[in-house]
Every structure is written in C-alpha cells, then in structure tokens.
C-alpha cells in the first residue's frame, strides 16, 4: 500500500512522492518500512541476496535497480569473449560450495554440465556467466524493484539534535518519473561504477558519435547501420576493453578502419600469475586494510598490472600478429585496417558538420598538441569507471560523514560500514558500501573475486548492528 504525498517545497519543482507503507511486521520506530534497502542489483547485491537466502536470514529487504532487468556489463558482452577469472569465483561457491546458486548447479539445471566439462576450461564465456547471474536473479523477483533510480539518501532524526535513527531514500521511476520515498535502518550501496570520461571532455557536451564503452553494443548498430560501410573508428584506452572493442569492430564492419589511441608507451600484458593472483583472495583484504595510507598506495601501484590498463597476453599477441601481417601485406600505413597510436592523450574533440569527430591529441613526451590524422565516424571511450557515491546519492550526508586525513571524501570500517562523525547516527543504523572501497580494501573491491565471501561478512556486520528489542534474529 502507498500514500500519495505532494512535495510542497516552495523552491523545488512540484512533484508527487509515493511513500511506501510498511504493512504487517512494521518496525515500532515510526517511519521505518524496511530492515535493509540495497541500492543496486548487480553482482555485488545479488551475492548479498544469495547469502541471505542460503543462510535463511529473514528480513524486510528491498533491492532498487535502475535497469529494467538484471544485466551485467551488457554493453560489453562481446560474442566469444571470456571471463578473466575462474567460474569457481562465482556468487556462492567459495562461501558455500553446496549452495543452489553455484555456477556448476546453474549448468546442471540448464543440462550443460557435462558439455561444459568437455571444454576443459575454468573460463566461461561472458555471455554465459551473465546468463548464470540472470538465472540467480530470477529467484529474487519479489525482493527487487527494477526501473528505480535512487536520487538521495538522508539521515532522519526523530528528535532534533539527537543521533539519526534511520535513513530515508528518494527513488525515481525511470519510465514515469514518479518519485517514491522509502526508509530503512540499514542501507547497502552497491550501485556499481559510473562511466569515467576523460576530465578534459567531461566539461563539454559530447556528440552522439562519442560513446563510452559501457554502451558499445547497444549503440554501435544504431549509429552505424551499414555492415559494409567504410567507417572509421577511434577507440581511446589501452586496457582489455579497448582492445576487445577494436577487435570486435573489425569483425562487424569488414571495410572499417580502426585506430586505437592510448597514452601509454605500449600495450601491456596483465599479470595473472598464481602468486600475484593471491591479492584477490578474500583473506588478503584483512592484510591490506591493516596497512597505513602510504603502504596502501604503494601496494595498489605495485599491483596495478593485474587490473588497470592491461591486456591478457593471448589477445595482446594476436593484435601484434595482426599488425605485423598488415606491414608485409601493405607497406602504406594509410591503408591499414588497424592502427595503434601510443603516447597520445586526448585533449579535446571537434564535431564536424557531417557528424564526424576530429580528436586533439597531445604527445605525452613532447607535450605538443595536434589534430588527429583522420576524422572518425564513431569514437569509443574505453576509459573505465569512477566510483564515489558521496558525490551523488549520498551527498546529503556529506556534512556528517567522517572524512579521513588523506583527502578522501569518506572512510569505511573493515566491515565496509561508512563511518559517520561521532554522535551523528545511532549504532543500530548504518550504511555499507560495496565496490567503492578500493583505496581501503584493495584491488579486489570492485571485482567478482570476493563477492561470495564479502556478502556474508557484510550481513554479519548488519545483523550485529541491529539492537532493536523486537529483533532477535540470529545467524
């Protein structure tokens, strides 16, 4: 049941806000409808839902997801692309190999287990792993509301001047624009990353022919519809996504020309050797968190080659082979279907009258800025993601969040709980952050590797924080 309220804020655009009523089992604290609200329903949130189901944890829980259905990096589910981690690091196995929600049980349910075994691989196709997660998500439709974008989270004081007792969220239906108000004692922010646009471009309106890699699959066919068209593409970035997109373009558009632009001096291989991979073990989080700020920064820099701006070696070797073959088949570089431009940073762009794009490129050694040698029909920014919820939905809490001395806008405890200033929020209410704690919890924070274990750690923390008299739930 919902109550329709008018937003009577005199300096705001008038809108209708729907306030959810808690119904049966409502908390005795006035206005609190849910025990847990999770913002987002991607892999991190899904792992939490699975852990709750596996452990039999009964809570009034709601997941709010802005997408119309579950999807994992749908803009980058390139045909034939494979996972970069073992299927054993799924959403449940490391925590509980007997869970209904393991990847192996998914294969069993889909009658593909034996056939998958015949592949002799630990690396499923990304399309299949996405389907596995969609299968998991289908078990929680009663917990999830899709098409809901959370706009803000505020702390609510029942008594002015006293610590806040719970949190209020405002979400917007992305289809109708309708606003909804919800409340809970415990908030989990697992909304994923936002596309990172190079700073020099983020201040200007980007033409429709400049897209981020996150929307690649959904955009490329819409923008460039002729499969045999002689299109020119620029892909900006030097990591796995940038190279994969460059390869995919050439398979989709046989007559295309692709230029891969990276500010690095060369494409570099990722380090996925066994000893280095131990930094993604769940137990490594404790060690990393115990370090001081300087040691954390040093460790992140030292292990950067595992995850950022790097390419898996087989793909890198394939690209080099392709470049070499071009050279002996055609001595004129202007006729090559694929070019690699290193040591160049995008400093700006110009939209031409025919919707083509000219890039302004800076030589990273000399500092000289020049226009690109070609103009492009489509520019794809494979420039990663940014994660800072304090700058978006949690901004109303900015004044009561404890800010660390290292210049960050927030800090978290080992259990991923956002730290508030003393006396601002009661201990039996809290906010937990997922996927945006790399600087305090290590490189694995935004990856799939530790989701199964981390989800259970987070639930332990939430259950331990709840001290309401009527809530005696145990693990």
UniProtKB/Swiss-Prot annotation:
Q: Which residues bind FAD?
A: 65-73, 84, 150, 446-448
Instruction: Please give the Pfam families that the UniProt record associates with this protein.
Output: Lys_Orn_oxgnase
Task: Please give the record's induction comment.
Answer: Expression is induced during iron deprivation. Also induced in response to reactive nitrogen species. Expression is regulated by the transcription factor SRE1.
Q: Which Gene Ontology terms describe the biological processes this protein takes part in?
A: biosynthetic process; intracellular iron ion homeostasis
Sorted alphabetically, the keyword list is: FAD, Flavoprotein, Monooxygenase, NADP, Oxidoreductase
Citing just one GO molecular function, the answer is: ornithine N5-monooxygenase activity
Known catalytic reactions: L-ornithine + NADPH + O2 = N(5)-hydroxy-L-ornithine + NADP(+) + H2O; L-ornithine + NADH + O2 = N(5)-hydroxy-L-ornithine + NAD(+) + H2O
Residues annotated as binding substrate are 89, 277-280, 307, 449
- Cofactor(s) essential for the protein: FAD
> What outcome is recorded for mutants in which this gene has been deleted?
Results in poor growth under low iron conditions and loss of siderophore production. Also leads to a significant growth defect in human and murine macrophages and attenuation in the mouse model of infection.
Q: What is its EC number?
A: 1.14.13.196
Q: State the protein's purpose.
A: L-ornithine N(5)-monooxygenase; part of the gene cluster that mediates the biosynthesis of hydroxamate-containing siderophores that play a critical role in virulence via intracellular iron acquisition during macrophage infection. SID1 catalyzes the conversion of L-ornithine to N(5)-hydroxyornithine, the first step in the biosynthesis of all hydroxamate-containing siderophores.
Please give the subunit comment from the record.
Homotetramer.
Family, per entry: Belongs to the lysine N(6)-hydroxylase/L-ornithine N(5)-oxygenase family.
Question: What is the recorded name of this protein?
Answer: L-ornithine N(5)-monooxygenase
Q: Which organism is it from?
A: Ajellomyces capsulatus (Darling's disease fungus)
Which gene specifies this protein's sequence? SID1
